[in-house]
A protein has these predicted regions:
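Acidic catalytic motifs of isoprenoid enzymes
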Residues: 1-183, 190, 194-234, 238, ...
Length: 284
């Protein structure tokens, strides 16, 4: 479901892209160090965004360096290392475990079961380190699975379940910034859930699988459906942006530039691609 919280690359200078790459590569290395190859398989732009956001908010000391890795053995790449990349790696591993388990339960993919089993020994330590976040993950994913299994098309309930999950991930500490971070994560989580449904509509329809937007697609003409989806996505990103603006993050800092780019431009990149592809197919 992750992979929608990306940059608008044309809006950034080379130095800013290097800074982003440092966090992304840093998260990959941290996942490898803490969870091995299975953890690295779950690497996402979304959790790199969480690390950048929290680093900027808490002004966390960060070590930057360069180095080679197995996927990129020839050219050195920028790397970042700090405690919030450790946190993002922990959240990535926990979410990956539940995702692999869900894939196994839904489709009986043996590869997914094997990956879940590799991460399972890490769960007790994760629950001990982050009890609030892990408890919320379990509760909200159970809630989401129950809604989807029942064939619910209550978009508010579906979006709120995933939004509450991501909101708790954003709330690194239970401090003065936690309400804004939770609100931001709620809006972004709802956007991600809707965007995933929007992206997968045709595939889910072919396979006879649940899709939160299927009823809307069945009830509305194509143009009205597209307009309504855009309205829903805009509403959720508006909630996210409103809460983001309450945080003391300066737009002209290196991390601030990446965050503003992502929230106001980058998240719409995949939407634009999916909509363009769908409209092209419609006119073939």
């Amino acid at each position: 479901m992750f992979g929608y919280v990306t940059l608008y690359r044309k809006g950034l200078a080379d130095a800013e892209m290097d800074r982003y790459q440092a966090y992304y590569c840093g998260l990959c290395r941290t996942l490898g160090r803490r969870y091995g190859r299975t953890g690295q398989l779950a690497l996402s732009y979304d959790m790199a965004f969480v690390a950048i956001l929290l680093t900027a908010l808490y002004d966390t000391p960060t070590a930057f360096s360069e180095g080679r890795c197995v996927p990129h053995p020839l050219k050195k790449r920028p790397r970042a290392d700090n405690e919030l990349l450790d946190y993002a790696a922990d959240m990535t591993a926990a979410l990956a475990y539940y995702n692999f388990l869900d894939d196994w339960q839904d489709d009986h993919r043996r590869a997914s079961l094997a990956q879940a089993q590799k991460l399972e020994p890490s769960l007790p330590a994760l629950r001990e380190r982050w009890p609030r976040q892990l408890q919320t993950m379990a509760v909200q994913l159970d809630r989401l699975n129950a809604l989807e299994s029942a064939g619910s098309h209550d978009l508010d309930a579906l979006c709120n379940a995933f939004g509450a999950l991501l909101g708790e991930v954003f709330a690194y500490r239970d401090d003065i910034w936690a309400p804004a971070l939770r609100g931001m994560g709620n809006g972004l989580g709802a956007f991600i859930y809707l965007m995933d449904a929007y992206d997968d509509l045709e595939k889910d329809s072919r396979r006879g699988q649940f899709n939160a937007l299927q009823q809307l697609a069945d009830e509305l003409p194509p143009a009205a459906y597209e307009q309504r989806c855009h309205e829903l996505l805009t509403q959720q990103m508006g909630r996210c942006a409103q809460q983001f603006e309450m945080l003391p993050i300066l737009k002209d800092t290196p991390e601030g530039k990446l965050l503003y780019n992502t929230i106001y431009s980058g998240v719409w990149s995949k939407y634009a691609l999916v909509r363009k592809h769908r409209e092209a197919k419609r006119h073939d």
